[in-house]
């Protein structure tokens, strides 16, 4: 069947909705008239000015001569003339048929306000490296982490699993053993929850702080960058109600190609032939296990992927009510979402609630709260992807009564039934988060510009995971077991913030911010297990029924105190200076290094404000920025600087019962100190041709010193290792963001956003030892740490093809079809000395993002493509390893004398060198396509609505890659129960949604 026709038949509802939108777009207009004119600035015509009928989507754009023409309803209204860099003008139409306004240049130029941490700044005055995630140009269903894709310097690797946030990095990896995740700040308060706790529809803005100048205000927590999330507030004087809902389905974007029964049989025959054994196709039943032979004879087979798959589905409803009065600003929201993954029993249900309220008690006093509660239900044990790709297509998944087998091929037991654990288990996993901030702001009546704000932010997290494994009636032993895990965390933040803003004459502006803060965290967890239940009716609700019982518990607390000062200064509104210093103290370090100070400074110069630049008509804005500073990373768990004890049993004398005693377990280190990252940043911001082209180029160079690493020590000391500060890691790179306004027409607009990021990560120093005396610092092969190479590089033999029949250089012990590796030292012998760093896979060398936004009348289309280039990862499924058994059923091909592949080994190759098989993870992906329609104002008036938008979104629609797994994005960055060769699919998703406001 024609592929396009098949698509229409499979998703007819999408086509129907598009037809409905087009029909409604033709709703009869009331009687109209035309208004025209010319827009100027001074004596010059102004092309590209937006002309909009206020309160509607009716608009036009001035041509190259500044002329416009717009059709409006007979009753008239108000025209709004706007353009970046100029003050907007509103003109009442009345009976006029011609309106020619004169725009005045916005003196501030870039008046966009950006959240910078402990306050806001006009974008023009920013001196540090801050990037914004443009939520308005993303699909309405997008989650919080996906909004970061395409932000220069930000790397996000998706997992494809419901409820999982994936891996998020800003400008590479800084720490060898500590966390490399960025700090999350929600509404000005450090957020310790999961990003999936936050409803995307509650977010007003997201900023990414990347250099030391912008992150130093967060001191010891900011070495990996900072993401600032600001939630919404009320914007209209009358109450506004908004509803967003969507529903959609997901499917496999790329399914792992497994052996068909025919290919499975052929592989067994080829293996026997290559092994010198009989390989008669008529006797294949003798070469298979009993189960496989019976299924082959009876024509029974399975596709393990089909067995574990479920139809992916997504649905969500968001409701918010907002508004403002003279005394109160409020935003109230609730959301419900239900996501089913592509693998059986892998799901998430989420509900969130938010209340943002600010009240003006007196002209000088405001109080308020930002409170959020989330409830996430992750119950269920997903089917095993790992067992699925190991399962023979001739195996048996279920007995005749429908109960799951323990092993699809019982004779071999090489792979468990991927569905068994899911089907015989009850699982409940709930995660809840209550995050709040109560604040008061006082504007000093005795000194203009002085204000004081106090934040008190208590937050609670409750997690529990309960599991019960029922008796499998097909096994002869008692396999029942149960476990209950309960976790609780309480966290409070108290901040006192003093700000002072002052203007001195015409040329001097400055503001000062001072902070005194405290942070307390306490957490505890309890685990109880039971085994061998004779009664399983109560499941995990009565662990006392188990014959074997165990309990375990843990608790910790951390305290921090912080002091911060920041000064922003502008001279003539073109020279900017920012100085910041923060001092942090933490209980995780001993008394010797409990405190650390992190300073930074930055400068900016708006070159185009200089007199000598005024005659460059094509250049609208040129700004230079430079910054340098230091930030920190605690990077260790509580109590790691102390000498810790543990219990151990010992038998005295010649025997008898053991006694429980206390022994020292780890060696403390009073000199442990903070990891420190020092970063230099250089940037150029530019705008050309009346802001039709705008962008930023940045170069950064950061060094992280005093890395917290556990180092091996001689066992004669009584310990095997000690936590120390050693080594240095460098990250340097280049970032580009470019926005072009390609077409500005009355009925059609087209803009493009392009981003590029390059990061080079390398280890500069480790332990500064030279044990072999070769004059070079020693690497740490055990941890894959190599001087001059990226963190977690791959150290292995270098693949050089496959030995073929007729080759004259086949060494002893090898044969045609075996792997050839390079003799790097040229001694004629392949041994461990021939290993080298073959690549790295955590961070791509290059990232690209390209988004095109097109609008025709009320229709909008957004297309986003992203790419990651320059990284590899092991993909060991290429080698069957044990082809004589039902292990690893990837159909990647294999070497035979009839088909002499140069990149796949023969079936008898046993990989004696234990070489990994590496593949490129490079990809180019059509990540997001969104088509939307904004209904006409006249229809909205009839329905008494403020807004109505219908949209259709397709995500992960196509990927160009050589990666043989399900997806290269999560190919090496995520470790789960499926193993290091992660094969969990990132879904292809189609959504249809509706936004309604009234």
Where are these regions (language model features)?
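Extracytoplasmic gating/loop element in the C-terminal half of outer-membrane beta-barrel translocons
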Residues: 294, 392, 401, 405, ...
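Residues embedded in well-ordered regular secondary structure
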Residues: 129-132, 137-140, 150-157, 161-169, ...
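Small-side-chain secondary-structure face that scaffolds active or pore-lining regions
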Residues: 341-352, 372-387, 432-433, 439-534, ...
């Amino acid at each position: 069947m024609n592929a396009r026709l098949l698509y229409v038949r499979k998703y007819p509802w999408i086509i129907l909705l598009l037809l409905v939108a087009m029909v409604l777009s033709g709703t009869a207009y009331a009687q109209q008239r035309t208004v025209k004119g010319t827009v100027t600035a001074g004596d010059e015509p102004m092309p590209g000015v937006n002309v909009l009928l206020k309160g509607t989507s009716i608009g036009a754009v001035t041509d190259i001569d500044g002329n416009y023409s717009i059709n409006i309803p007979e009753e008239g209204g108000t025209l709004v003339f706007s353009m970046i860099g100029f003050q907007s003008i509103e003109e009442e139409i009345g009976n006029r048929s011609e309106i020619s306004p004169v725009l005045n240049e916005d003196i501030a130029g870039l008046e966009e306000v950006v959240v910078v941490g402990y306050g806001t700044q006009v974008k023009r005055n920013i001196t540090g490296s801050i990037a914004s995630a443009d939520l308005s140009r993303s699909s309405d269903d997008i989650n919080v982490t996906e909004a970061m894709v395409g932000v220069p310097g930000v790397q996000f690797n998706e997992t494809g699993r419901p409820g999982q946030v994936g891996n998020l990095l800003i400008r590479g990896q800084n720490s060898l053993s500590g966390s490399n995740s960025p700090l999350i700040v929600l509404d000005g308060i450090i957020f310790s929850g999961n990003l999936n706790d936050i409803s995307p529809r509650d977010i007003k803005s997201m900023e990414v702080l990347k250099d030391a100048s912008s992150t130093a205000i967060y001191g010891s927590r900011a070495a990996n960058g900072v993401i600032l999330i600001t939630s919404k507030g009320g914007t209209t004087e009358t109450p506004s109600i908004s509803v967003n809902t969507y529903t959609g389905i997901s499917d496999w974007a790329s399914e792992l190609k497994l052996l068909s029964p025919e290919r499975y049989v052929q592989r067994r025959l080829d293996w026997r032939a290559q092994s010198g054994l009989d390989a008669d196709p008529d006797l294949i039943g003798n070469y298979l296990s009993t189960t496989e032979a019976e299924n082959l004879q009876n024509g029974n087979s399975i596709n393990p992927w089909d067995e574990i798959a479920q139809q992916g589905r997504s649905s969500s409803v968001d409701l918010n009510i907002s508004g403002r009065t003279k005394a109160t600003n409020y935003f109230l929201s609730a959301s419900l979402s239900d996501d089913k993954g592509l693998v059986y029993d892998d799901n998430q249900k989420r509900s969130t609630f938010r209340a943002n309220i600010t009240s003006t008690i007196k002209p000088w006093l405001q109080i308020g709260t930002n409170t959020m509660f989330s409830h996430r239900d992750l119950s269920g044990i997903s089917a095993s992807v790992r067992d699925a790709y190991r399962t023979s297509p001739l195996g048996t998944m279920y007995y005749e009564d429908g109960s799951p087998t323990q092993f699809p091929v019982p004779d071999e037991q090489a792979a468990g039934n991927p569905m068994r654990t899911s089907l015989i288990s009850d699982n409940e996993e709930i995660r809840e988060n209550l995050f709040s901030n109560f604040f008061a702001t006082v504007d000093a009546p005795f000194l203009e510009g002085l204000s004081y704000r106090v934040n008190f932010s208590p937050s609670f997290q409750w997690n529990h995971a309960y599991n019960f494994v029922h008796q499998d009636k097909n096994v002869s032993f008692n396999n029942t077991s149960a476990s209950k895990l309960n976790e609780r965390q309480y966290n409070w933040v108290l901040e006192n913030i003093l700000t002072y803003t002052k203007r001195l004459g015409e040329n001097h502006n400055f503001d000062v911010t001072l902070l005194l803060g405290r942070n307390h965290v306490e957490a505890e967890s309890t685990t109880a297990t039971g085994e061998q239940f004779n009664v399983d009716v109560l499941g995990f609700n009565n662990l006392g029924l188990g014959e074997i019982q165990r309990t375990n518990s843990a608790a910790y607390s951390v305290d921090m105190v912080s002091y911060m000062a920041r000064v922003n200064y502008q001279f003539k509104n073109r020279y900017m200076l920012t100085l910041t210093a923060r001092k942090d103290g933490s209980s995780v370090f001993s008394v010797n290094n409990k405190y650390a100070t992190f300073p930074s400074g930055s400068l900016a110069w708006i070159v185009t404000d200089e007199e000598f630049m005024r005659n460059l008509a094509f250049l609208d804005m040129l700004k230079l920025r430079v910054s340098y500073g230091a930030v920190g990373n605690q990077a260790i768990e509580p109590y790691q600087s102390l000498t810790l004890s543990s219990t151990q049993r010992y038998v005295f004398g010649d025997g008898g019962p053991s006694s429980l005693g206390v022994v020292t377990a780890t060696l403390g280190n009073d000199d442990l100190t903070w990891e420190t990252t020092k970063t230099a940043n250089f940037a150029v911001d530019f705008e050309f041709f009346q802001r039709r082209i705008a962008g930023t180029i940045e170069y950064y160079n950061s060094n992280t010193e005093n890395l917290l690493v556990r180092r091996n020590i001689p066992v004669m000391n009584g310990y095997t290792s000690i936590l120390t500060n050693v080594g240095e890691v460098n990250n340097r790179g280049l970032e580009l963001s470019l926005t072009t306004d390609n077409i500005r027409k009355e009925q059609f607009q087209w803009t493009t956003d392009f981003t590029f990021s390059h990061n080079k990560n390398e280890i500069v120093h480790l332990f500064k030892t030279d044990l072999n005396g070769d004059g070079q610092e020693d690497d740490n092969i055990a941890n894959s740490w190599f001087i001059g190479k990226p963190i977690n590089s791959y150290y292995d033999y270098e693949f050089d093809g496959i030995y073929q029949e007729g080759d004259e250089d086949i060494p002893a012990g090898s044969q045609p079809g075996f792997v050839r590796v390079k003799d790097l030292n040229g001694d004629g012998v392949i041994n461990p000395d021939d290993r080298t760093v073959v690549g790295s896979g955590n961070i791509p060398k290059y990232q690209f993002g390209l988004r095109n936004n097109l609008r025709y009348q009320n229709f909008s289309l957004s297309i986003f493509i992203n790419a990651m280039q320059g990284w590899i990862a092991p993909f060991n499924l290429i080698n069957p390893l044990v082809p004589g058994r039902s292990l690893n059923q990837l159909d990647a091909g294999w070497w035979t004398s009839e088909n002499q592949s140069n990149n796949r080994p023969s079936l008898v190759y046993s990989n004696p060198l234990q070489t990994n098989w590496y593949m490129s993870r490079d990809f180019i992906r059509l990540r997001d396509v969104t088509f939307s329609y904004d209904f006409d104002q006249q229809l909205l008036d009839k329905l008494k609505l403020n807004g109505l938008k219908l949209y259709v979104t397709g995500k992960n629609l196509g990927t160009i890659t050589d990666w043989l797994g399900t997806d290269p994005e999560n190919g090496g960055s995520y470790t789960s129960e499926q193993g290091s060769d992660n094969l969990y699919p990132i879904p292809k998703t189609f959504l249809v949604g509706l936004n309604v406001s009234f």
